[in-house]
């Protein structure tokens, strides 16, 4: 499917590059049961748990009328590895920005296990 990438994903990607400059953001695009495409089963490790929390955060953001987290752009700043969501965001943007900010910080603190990249979702994420 050649759909455009949701706008917010670019911002989330840049946030990840702010907190984890040593890794490609692609390393997080298909990891465990929750990072990227998945969303079921038990998280395989702490990093995968970061993504589960991020998914849940987006689900909560969707409760805000008209809020579509994957498409919502927001205002933020990256300074020396520190992320700040800026005050110009409305309720939806502020919530989504915080979801992404907390996930990017979570990624920076979680060990990366190469064995959990591109796993078999059917086998391991029931």
UniProtKB/Swiss-Prot annotation:
Its cofactor is Ca(2+). Disulfide bonds join 18-78, 33-125, 35-51, 50-106, 57-99, 67-92, 85-97. It comes from the Eukaryota. Expressed by the venom gland. GO terms for cellular component: extracellular region. Residues 1 form the signal peptide. Residues 2-7 form a propeptide. Pfam families: Phospholip_A2_1 (PF00068). One of its GO terms (biological process) is arachidonate secretion. This is Acidic phospholipase A2 4. It comes from Naja sagittifera (Andaman cobra).
